[in-house]
Amino acid sequence: MSKRNTPPLRSSGINTIQINAAREMHAQTVRARRMPMPTSGITTPSVQPTAAPATPPRHICNNPNNPQCLHCGSVIIPSPRATLPLEDNPSISINDWTISSRKKPILNSQELDIWENEKLKGLTLPEMIFGNNYIRIENSKQHWSIEFNALDALKEVQLQDSGIRVAYSNDWINSKKRQNSTNGAQRFTNDVNDDSLNIIHKYDWTYTTRYKGTESSPESKFRLDNDQKLPLDKLAVHDKILFYDDMILFEDELADNGISILNVKIRVMNERLLLLSRFFLRVDDVLVRVYDTRIYVEFDENVVIRESKEFEGKYQDVLAKHRLSQSHDPKAALRDSNWVAQNTPMIKRQCEIIQF
């Protein structure tokens, strides 16, 4: 009887030692994530701490797509639910006041045609228009509201020549004069000037607008009072922000010669709100301009203050105030509207008030 040669058993799979090591490593990780437990062997009956009843917030979140946070009460922006086309309509109410906003994409080609041919005749439109965006502040008891939107802002752009020229315009005119002189057309030399540019549509190509908001009432309820000032002491208090939004209404890069942009932002606290509408213009090597409009509302007192400031200065004068020699981009500060507003002379201030 022959003896069968049986091959030696081969170990397959993961070694038992490796498995145990992996289990121990996992257990250590789990233990590290657990909160430390008391080591005393004496057990005491657990007593549930009695928490004081929380004061119910007086603000109401009106949009179910933008619920308030269960921990801090703030309105959740943007909405957690995605929709097509993209749209966001957060809203909040405090006392008789309701603050709402809407965000949508830039105007499509069909909407642009309607704006250019019907709503804004004679104005060549900016490159980007968020025409369906707005921020609205409304008092339901007084049937009054003020809204910031792109259409009404662009309606205040002048349909005439602003007189502002890009930095190289004089060089272009001088080159034309030299060219005419070289070609023997001396009699036409003096005819090459701004009038010979053949501007078909005369409008302010910088899109400068002194837009201060659109009121619902036919006549403004604001009363001029330049002695009024924004209560900076109240605004300096670190109150919880219940509602915040920030949006662009329109923007244009001026054919790579600068920037023209209108931006609106708002923050709402429990007792007050502050809105800032800022038009920022920078024409490279020519000028900078900032037009600020701030709306302040005190909810309990039903007071509305509107303050407008205009800043303007020559490009090189403002640039000279930027002394960061270690910066690789010395003109970076001129792309910051906050820095420009702080370092540009104020040429006008106006303050108005409403007391309901």
Curated annotation (Swiss-Prot):
Q: Does the record's keyword annotation contain Nucleus? A: yes
- Kindly provide the PTM information from the record: Phosphorylation. Dephosphorylated by SIT4.
Q: Which UniProt keywords apply?
A: Cytoplasm, Nucleus, Phosphoprotein, Signal transduction inhibitor
Q: For this UniProt entry, what's an example GO CC term?
A: cytosol
Q: Where is the composition biased (Polar residues)?
A: 40-49
**Top-level taxon:** Eukaryota
- Which residues lie within the region annotated Disordered? 36-55
Q: Name one GO biological process term.
A: negative regulation of TORC1 signaling
Phosphothreonine-modified residues are where? 55
Kindly list the places in or outside the cell where this protein is found, as annotated in its UniProt entry. Cytoplasm; Nucleus
Q: Which GO terms describe its molecular function?
A: protein phosphatase activator activity
Give a short account of what the protein does: Involved in negative regulation of the TOR signaling pathway in response to type of available nitrogen source. Indirectly activates the PP2A phosphatase SIT4 via interaction with its suppressor TAP42. This interaction is enhanced under nitrogen limitation conditions. Also has a role in regulation of NPR1 in response to nitrogen limitation.
Q: Which family does it belong to?
A: Belongs to the TIP41 family.
What is the protein's quaternary organization?
Interacts with TAP42 and NPR1.
Per its record, how is this protein called by name? Type 2A phosphatase activator TIP41
Q: State the organism of origin.
A: Saccharomyces cerevisiae (strain ATCC 204508 / S288c) (Baker's yeast)
